[in-house]
Amino acid sequence: DPSRNDLFTATKGRGAFMNDRRIRVSKRTRLEECLISTGFPFRPGDNFKNYMNMMADVMQRTAGMRRPGAAALDLAYVAAGFTDGFFETGLKPWDVAAGSLLVTEAGGLIGNFTGEADFMDHQECMAGAPRIYGQLVPLLSKYSKFAGAGDKAAVRQAAAELTLNKEAATAPAAQDPIEPGTASDAPF
């Protein structure tokens, strides 16, 4: 992030770092407490109306949305826990390749809107902490260009069941406090 003089690095199997400090995705588990980052459509042919519907679906269920910068920076912020999730369409492999390694090495998940890990050539990308990623799939899968209506419904149902099963299996826990330094390090 040149505006903050931060350097994000990752090596497969060795972790993700910001300025030589280990980073991890956020610990939040409830979508309504999360900040989600995204990009905005700007190219001729982008379906602006569809993107606005997608943003409305996400905004109604989260604490807010941000537009920090390039997709690579958005993914770096997910990896550092500054934001809890990310989604965008119209992306090329060079937009997300480095950021995808940051996210996975920081403990997050990344894929297309139906949750499949094969996303590089799909021009749609979604990332987040595992529990948040699982809650974004049913919201965003209906906007995927790569799944039929039946597939989209099945993905939403499976994600909903997975979330319910996880919530039922875990006893109510105290809210995770914000880690010292994390909030003050956030760029917004």
Give residue ranges: language-model regions:
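Acidic beta-strand-loop-alpha-helix segment within the catalytic core
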Residues: 1-75, 122-188
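Hydrophobic residues within well-ordered alpha-helices
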Residues: 76-79, 97-105
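Alpha-to-beta junction loops
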Residues: 80-85, 105-109
